[in-house]
C-alpha cells in the first residue's frame, strides 16, 4: 500500500539514460550554460532564455513519459538530472513556465477541478497540503516548492486512455459496473502507485467516461458503453446487476472451497481404510456426502444467478439492437424524405429523353456535310474492287514464239499495249549486232497470237 513516507524515500524520476541529448557528455561549455540559473526576466536576454527553456522543457516531459509517470516533483527531477555532482539550477523556472502554459498542473488544483469527494475519506494524502504551499499560493508566490506534486496534463490523458482500453479488452467489460478493487488489480501494471490510479480515475471522470459511487461500504465504478459515449449515472438496475455479479463470484468461490473440502474428506477416508479405522473412514465419507449435497445446492443457486445474468445481458444486447434499428429507420426516413415513386419515374423519363436527344445529335454530327452531292455506295465499292485487282496483278513474261504455227486453244492471247511496242522497236533499232536471222521473227513474236482456223 502506498504511504507518504515510502513515496518520500523513492524518487519518481529515476535514471534518464537514453533520453539525454549528445551534448550532455560531449559539450562541456554548453552544459555549463544549460545548468546555470535563468535570468530574473526573459527581457534581459531572450535568446539565452529561450535556448535553455527549449532544452529543458521537452526533456522533462519526455523523461516522465519514458518512466511511465504522470506526477512530477522538483526534487526528483534535480536528482534525475544530476551531472558530475551538479544539479540544474533552472529547473524550478522550467516548471513554472510549464505551469503557465498549462502543460503541468498542481495536483491540488487538478483535484479541485473534479468531484473527488469519493476519495477524500479513502486516500487522506490528497488533503495533506503543507502550510507553506498554502501561504505561498495566497501571497502570490509562483515559486515551485521542491516537494510539491505536479501533474503532466497530456501524460495523464494518455494514461487514462490506456486504462480505458485495458478495461474494454478485459472480461470485466461484460458489464459497465465494476468494483474499484478489481479495477485497481487490473491496472496494477499501468499505474505504478495508488495515487496515479486515482488521478487516472479522476481524469476519466472529468472526461465523463466513468462515475464512481460507494455502495454498502464498497466503491464501484461505472464505465461509458462506448469510447465516445458519455457515462450515465449509476441507477438501481446497475446496482442490482452488480450485486448479482458479486453473488455469482461469492457462490463460485464457495463451491470451489467446498469441492476442496470434499476431496479432503475423501482422502481422509482412504487413509483411514488403509489404517483399518473403519469408523473414522465412515465419518469421513458422511462428511464428504454432506459437503457434496451443499455443493449441489450451491450449484443450483449459481445456475439461477447465472441464468438471470444471461437474460440481463441478452436484454441489454436486444436493447442495443433495437436502438440501432430505430436510429437506422430514422436515418432512412430522413434520407427518403423528398423521394417518391412518381418523382423517380419522372426522373427516369427525363433521363431517357435526354439520352435519345443526345443520340440523335451524335448521328446528325456523324453524317457530315455532303455539299449537295449524293454518292452511290455500291458503285464506289465496285470501283474499289477493280482498282484492287489491277494493283495486285503481276507482270507476265512473254513466251517464246513457238515453231509450230498450229496453236491450240489453250494458249492465252496476251495483250500488248502501244507503249510496249514502241519500247521494243526502240531496243531493236539501237542493238549493236542487229537482228540475227532466225525463224523466230520479232515482229511476228510481238504480233498477237491468232487462233488457227
From Swiss-Prot:
One Gene Ontology cellular component annotation held by this UniProt entry: cytosol
UniProt xrefs under Pfam families: Snf7, WHD_CHMP7
Residue positions, PTM Phosphothreonine: 408
Gene3D superfamilies with a match to the protein in the record: 6.10.250.1710, ESAT-6-like
Keyword ATP-binding attributed: no
Keywords, ordered alphabetically: Coiled coil, Cytoplasm, Nucleus, Phosphoprotein, Protein transport, Transport
Protein's job: ESCRT-III-like protein required to recruit the ESCRT-III complex to the nuclear envelope (NE) during late anaphase. Together with SPAST, the ESCRT-III complex promotes NE sealing and mitotic spindle disassembly during late anaphase. Recruited to the reforming NE during anaphase by LEMD2. Plays a role in the endosomal sorting pathway.
Family per record: Belongs to the SNF7 family.
Complexes and interactors: Interacts with CHMP4B, but not with VPS25. Interacts with LEMD2 (via C-terminus).
Protein's UniProt name: Charged multivesicular body protein 7
Amino acid at each position: 500500500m502506498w504511504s507518504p513516507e515510502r513515496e518520500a524515500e523513492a524518487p519518481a524520476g529515476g535514471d534518464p539514460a537514453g533520453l539525454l541529448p549528445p551534448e550532455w557528455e560531449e559539450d562541456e561549455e554548453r552544459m555549463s550554460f544549460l545548468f546555470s540559473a535563468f535570468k530574473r526576466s526573459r527581457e534581459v536576454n531572450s535568446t539565452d532564455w529561450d535556448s535553455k527553456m527549449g532544452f529543458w522543457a521537452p526533456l522533462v516531459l519526455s523523461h516522465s513519459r519514458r518512466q511511465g509517470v504522470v506526477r512530477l516533483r522538483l526534487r526528483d527531477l534535480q536528482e534525475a538530472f544530476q551531472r558530475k555532482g551538479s544539479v540544474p539550477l533552472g529547473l524550478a523556472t522550467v516548471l513554472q513556465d510549464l505551469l503557465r502554459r498549462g502543460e503541468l498542473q498542481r495536483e491540488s488544483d487538478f483535484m479541485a477541478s473534479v468531484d473527488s469527494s469519493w476519495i477524500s475519506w479513502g486516500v487522506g494524502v490528497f488533503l495533506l497540503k503543507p502550510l507553506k504551499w498554502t501561504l505561498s499560493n495566497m501571497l502570490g508566490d509562483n515559486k515551485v516548492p521542491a516537494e510539491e506534486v505536479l501533474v503532466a496534463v497530456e501524460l495523464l490523458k494518455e494514461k487514462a486512455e490506456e486504462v480505458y482500453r485495458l478495461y474494454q479488452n478485459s472480461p470485466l467489460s461484460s458489464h459497465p459496473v465494476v468494483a474499484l478493487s478489481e479495477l485497481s488489480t487490473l491496472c496494477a501494471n499501468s499505474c505504478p502507485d495508488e495515487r496515479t490510479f486515482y488521478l487516472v480515475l479522476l481524469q476519466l471522470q472529468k472526461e465523463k467516461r466513468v462515475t464512481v459511487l460507494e455502495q454498502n461500504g464498497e466503491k464501484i465504478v461505472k464505465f461509458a458503453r462506448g469510447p465516445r459515449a458519455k457515462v450515465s449515472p449509476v441507477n438501481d438496475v446497475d446496482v442490482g446487476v452488480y450485486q448479482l455479479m458479486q453473488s455469482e463470484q461469492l457462490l463460485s468461490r464457495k463451491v470451489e472451497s467446498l469441492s476442496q473440502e470434499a476431496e479432503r474428506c475423501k482422502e481422509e477416508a482412504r487413509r483411514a481404510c488403509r489404517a483399518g479405522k473403519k469408523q473414522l473412514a465412515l465419518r469421513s465419507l458422511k462428511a464428504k456426502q454432506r459437503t457434496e449435497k451443499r455443493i449441489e445446492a450451491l450449484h443450483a443457486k449459481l445456475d439461477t444467478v447465472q441464468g438471470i445474468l444471461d437474460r440481463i445481458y441478452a436484454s441489454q444486447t436486444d436493447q442495443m439492437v433495437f436502438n440501432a434499428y430505430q436510429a437506422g429507420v430514422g436515418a432512412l426516413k430522413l434520407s427518403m424524405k423528398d423521394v417518391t415513386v412518381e418523382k423517380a419515374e419522372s426522373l427516369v423519363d427525363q433521363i431517357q429523353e435526354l439520352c435519345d436527344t443526345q443520340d440523335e445529335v451524335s448521328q446528325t454530327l456523324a453524317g457530315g456535310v455532303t455539299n449537295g452531292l449524293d454518292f452511290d455506295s455500291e458503285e464506289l465499292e465496285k470501283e474499289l474492287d477493280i482498282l484492287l485487282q489491277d494493283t495486285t496483278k503481276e507482270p507476265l513474261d512473254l513466251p517464246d514464239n513457238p515453231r509450230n504455227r498450229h496453236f491450240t486453244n489453250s494458249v492465252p492471247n496476251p495483250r500488248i499495249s502501244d507503249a510496249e511496242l514502241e519500247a521494243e522497236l526502240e531496243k531493236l533499232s539501237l542493238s549493236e549486232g542487229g537482228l540475227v536471222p532466225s525463224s523466230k521473227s520479232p515482229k511476228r513474236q510481238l504480233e498477237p497470237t491468232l487462233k488457227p482456223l
